[in-house]
Amino acid sequence: MAAVSLSVSTVKPLGDRVFVKISESEEKTAGGILLPDTAKEKPQVGEVVQVGPGKSNDDGSRQAPEVGIGDKVLYSKYAGTDIKLGSDEYVLLSEKDILAVVG
């Protein structure tokens, strides 16, 4: 089996899926206490880096995605599939798991 080299540019989401770079989680509490990895909350915010062509409708047409590359999004806490590429973490989500576009 041949090895596959993955990078952000080689990941092409299918259908209504969206590839999101996860924002860094907080390293400290508001009071300045350092958090161990096991105590950190799973981030729910990230930046869209790839977007699929959209959801297929019953008539064969595509519904264009509501988000685009560069949008900062808020998504469901346990949604999607986590993927690590190099030192960066990503999540592959269905568009329905995105709750809002933020700031």
From Swiss-Prot:
Disulfide bonds: none annotated. GO terms for cellular component: cytoplasm. It comes from the Bacteria. One of its GO terms (biological process) is chaperone cofactor-dependent protein refolding. Gene3D superfamilies: GroES chaperonin. GO terms for molecular function: ATP binding; metal ion binding; protein folding chaperone; protein-folding chaperone binding; unfolded protein binding. HAMAP family: CH10. This is Co-chaperonin GroES. It comes from Synechococcus sp. (strain CC9311). The lineage of its organism: Bacteria, Bacillati, Cyanobacteriota, Cyanophyceae, Synechococcales.
